[in-house]
């Protein structure tokens, strides 16, 4: 994995080098350092700019447990490709030969698609999910990954053609600050692509809310085990009701069951996955829905207003996918401001 031109010491805004002086990070690399003496540990081939998963620990456990579940290359179904294509405006050509920052990369469902579409991808995640992403994507040309906090990301401001953050912002403490940070890494005339949960009928059911209150704050290991047991217990009912759904009485019973079951069920949306993968997706997304510490909701108008307040242009925001999907461009006028910040935002220690 090669060091990238965008990578820098987050404290001193200067280049980082591997301990052996080469431009490559390998499993033998112990740390990265800047010329002022900061050292960033490299563990299992991945630079670690944070020492813990913080509020994202459950996601780290989740993505390592379901490392390939949502990868199109594993499922053989273009669910992730369709979503990414739609969010990019209709074509993956938007990232070809572009530098792309992917924040909250998880296990790599979008990372692998960005790479296969010809992008140079700088992937990052706050959680240990980076290990699953590395397992799935390392070796691909143009791939770099690190574990880091968005608000202290080790890259120069205004240095990426495209910044992608999907399925993430709603899980951060302050979504508007998250969007502002994402915008800061977009080049002038570059593209920002985001999404966010919406208010609506898909909100948490009462039983899911109660279980979530019980699980949030517990150890990731306990929460994952609890959800796996819950899904194993209830999934046979989901399958049975789906199988006999053509009977009107069963269809009515199924609608009622789906309104009270804490298990997420994708039979109506992704039946092409087949029974085995539908079960895996149910376990994955039920865990995701019941263990996230933050679960914010926003309207299209709120997302659009946020982007406008940040000075973004060409804003397109609409309801779709997981909620609100939006993209916007940074105006060319921001080029000088980014340069000034990169030169002056220095501190004495990391």
Located regions from the model:
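Conserved class I S-adenosyl-L-methionine
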Residues: 191-225, 232
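Conserved N-terminal segment of class I S-adenosyl-L-methionine
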Residues: 1-157, 162, 295-296, 302, ...
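N-terminal cap/leader regions of alpha/beta-hydrolase-fold enzymes
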Residues: 26, 166, 179-182
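Glycine-rich, histidine-containing beta strand-loop boundary motifs that form or position
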Residues: 125, 147, 167, 196-198
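Substrate-binding/catalytic lobe of Class I Rossmann-like enzymes that use SAM or dcSAM, i.e.
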Residues: 207, 219-308
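A short glycine-rich, Lys/Arg-flanked "PGG" loop and its adjoining helix->strand segment in the class I
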Residues: 176-188
């Amino acid at each position: 994995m090669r060091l990238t031109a965008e990578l820098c010491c987050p404290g001193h805004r200067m280049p980082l080098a591997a301990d052996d002086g080469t431009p490559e990070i390998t499993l033998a690399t112990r740390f990265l350092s800047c010329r002022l003496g900061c050292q960033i540990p490299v563990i299992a081939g991945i630079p670690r700019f944070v020492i813990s998963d913080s509020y994202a620990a459950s996601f780290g456990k989740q993505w390592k447990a379901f490392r390939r579940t949502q990868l199109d290359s594993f499922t053989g179904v273009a669910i992730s490709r369709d979503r990414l294509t739609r969010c990019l405006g209709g074509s993956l050509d938007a990232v070809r030969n572009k530098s792309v920052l992917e924040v909250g990369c998880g296990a790599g469902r979008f990372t692998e698609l960005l790479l296969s579409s010809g992008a140079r991808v700088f992937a990052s995640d706050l959680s240990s999910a980076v290990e699953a992403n590395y397992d799935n994507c390392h070796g691909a040309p143009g791939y770099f990954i690190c574990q880091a906090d968005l608000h202290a990301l080790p890259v120069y401001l205004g240095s990426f053609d495209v910044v992608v953050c999907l399925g993430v912002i709603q899980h951060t403490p302050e979504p508007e600050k998250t969007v502002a940070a994402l915008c800061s890494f977009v080049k002038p005339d570059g593209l920002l692509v985001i999404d966010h949960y919406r208010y609506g009928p898909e909100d948490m059911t009462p039983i899911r809310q109660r279980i979530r209150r019980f699980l949030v704050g517990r150890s990731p290991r306990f929460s994952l085990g609890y959800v796996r047991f819950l899904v194993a217990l209830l999934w046979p009912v989901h399958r049975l009701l789906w199988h006999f759904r053509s009977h009107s009485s069963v269809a009515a019973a199924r609608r009622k069951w789906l309104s009270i079951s804490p298990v997420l069920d994708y039979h109506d949306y992704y039946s092409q996955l087949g029974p085995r993968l539908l079960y895996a997706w149910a376990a994955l997304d039920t865990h995701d829905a019941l263990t996230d510490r933050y679960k914010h909701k926003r309207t299209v108008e709120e997302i659009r207003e946020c982007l406008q307040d940040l000075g973004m242009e060409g804003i397109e925001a609409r309801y779709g996918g997981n909620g609100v999907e939006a993209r916007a461009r940074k105006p060319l006028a921001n080029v000088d401001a980014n340069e000034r910040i990169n030169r002056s935002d220095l501190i004495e220690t990391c």
